[in-house]
């Protein structure tokens, strides 16, 4: 495993590890690779995505897991009819499910495009502007830090050492008078 390349037990070369269940682009990748019996190189841009666990890093565990019981609750002694309660539950759940799907269908790809552009710009600026500026600043500040260090060792160290010696001879006696 070197340079981001993965070689399996049969000598197949991959840029990312291949899972048993495959990915969205080529289902059952490993089985297909074994059937074809040739070296295939997979790009990180078409990396495998999990269609079952879509939040593997648990980014939204505490934010968007909102169920009917989290929003609507009837305390003891104040209950609606059972049919109304069941219909409300079904209406809430189905509406939330399909409206999310509708919003995802309408705005998912444009939002992915916007966030992709945003993070591309952010990465570009970090790589080509922020890090070079910080490195340049650190190189230039070394000169200032040497002058500052000489100043501190020449003037501040002796001054504070003298003040420390002056205050080190102070003795405090506390007596309690009855």
Curated annotation (Swiss-Prot):
Q: Which residues carry this modification: N6-acetyllysine?
A: 5
What does the PTM comment state?
Phosphorylated at Tyr-14 by ABL1 in response to oxidative stress.
Q: Where in the cell is it found?
A: Golgi apparatus membrane; Cell membrane; Membrane, Caveola; Membrane raft
Is Cell inner membrane given among the entry's keywords?
Answer: no
Spell out the residue ranges making up region: Required for homooligomerization. Answer: 2-94
* Residues with lipidation of kind S-palmitoyl cysteine: 133, 143, 156
Regarding the membrane, this protein is recorded as: Peripheral membrane protein
Q: Which GO terms describe its molecular function?
A: ATPase binding; identical protein binding; inward rectifier potassium channel inhibitor activity; nitric-oxide synthase binding; oxysterol binding; peptidase activator activity; protein heterodimerization activity; protein kinase binding
Q: Where is this region: Interacts with SPRY1, SPRY2, SPRY3 and SPRY4?
A: 131-142, 167-178
Cytoplasmic side of the membrane: what ranges?
2-104, 126-178
What is one process in the GO biological process aspect for this record? caveola assembly
For the cross-link Glycyl lysine isopeptide (Lys-Gly) (interchain with G-Cter in ubiquitin), the position is 5, 26, 30, 39, 47, 57
Query: Which ranges does the record annotate as intramembrane?
Result: 105-125
Q: Which UniProt keywords apply?
A: Acetylation, Cell membrane, Golgi apparatus, Isopeptide bond, Lipoprotein, Membrane, Palmitate, Phosphoprotein, Ubl conjugation
Q: Where is this region: Interacts with SPRY1, SPRY2, and SPRY4?
A: 149-160
Recorded GO cellular component terms are: acrosomal membrane; caveola; caveolar macromolecular signaling complex; cell cortex; cilium; endoplasmic reticulum; endosome; focal adhesion
List every stretch annotated Interaction with CAVIN3.
Answer: 82-94
Q: Which InterPro entries match?
A: Caveolin, Caveolin_CS
Positions bearing N-acetylserine: 2
Which residue positions does Phosphotyrosine occur at?
6, 14, 25
The family assignment reads: Belongs to the caveolin family.
Function of the molecule: May act as a scaffolding protein within caveolar membranes. Forms a stable heterooligomeric complex with CAV2 that targets to lipid rafts and drives caveolae formation. Mediates the recruitment of CAVIN proteins (CAVIN1/2/3/4) to the caveolae. Interacts directly with G-protein alpha subunits and can functionally regulate their activity. Involved in the costimulatory signal essential for T-cell receptor (TCR)-mediated T-cell activation. Its binding to DPP4 induces T-cell proliferation and NF-kappa-B activation in a T-cell receptor/CD3-dependent manner.
PANTHER family the UniProt entry points to = CAVEOLIN, CAVEOLIN-1
Q: What is this protein called?
A: Caveolin-1
Q: Which organism is it from?
A: Mustela putorius furo
**Gene from which the chain derives:** CAV1
């Amino acid at each position: 495993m070197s340079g981001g390349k993965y070689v399996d037990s049969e000598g197949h070369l991959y840029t990312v590890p291949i899972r048993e269940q495959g990915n969205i682009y080529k289902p059952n990748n490993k089985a297909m690779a074994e059937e074809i019996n040739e070296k295939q190189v997979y790009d990180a841009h078409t990396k495998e995505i999990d269609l079952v666990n879509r939040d593997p890093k648990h980014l939204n565990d505490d934010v968007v897991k909102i169920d009917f019981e989290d929003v609507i609750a009837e305390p003891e002694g104040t209950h609606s009819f059972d049919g109304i309660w069941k219909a409300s539950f079904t209406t809430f759940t189905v509406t939330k499910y399909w409206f999310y799907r509708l919003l995802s269908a309408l705005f998912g790809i444009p939002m992915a495009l916007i966030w992709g552009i945003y993070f591309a710009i952010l990465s570009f600026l970090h790589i080509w502007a922020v890090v070079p500026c910080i490195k340049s600043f650190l190189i230039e500040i070394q000169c200032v830090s040497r002058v500052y260090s000489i100043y501190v060792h020449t003037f501040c160290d002796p001054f504070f050492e003298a003040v420390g010696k002056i205050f080190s001879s102070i003795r405090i006696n506390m007596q309690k008078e009855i």
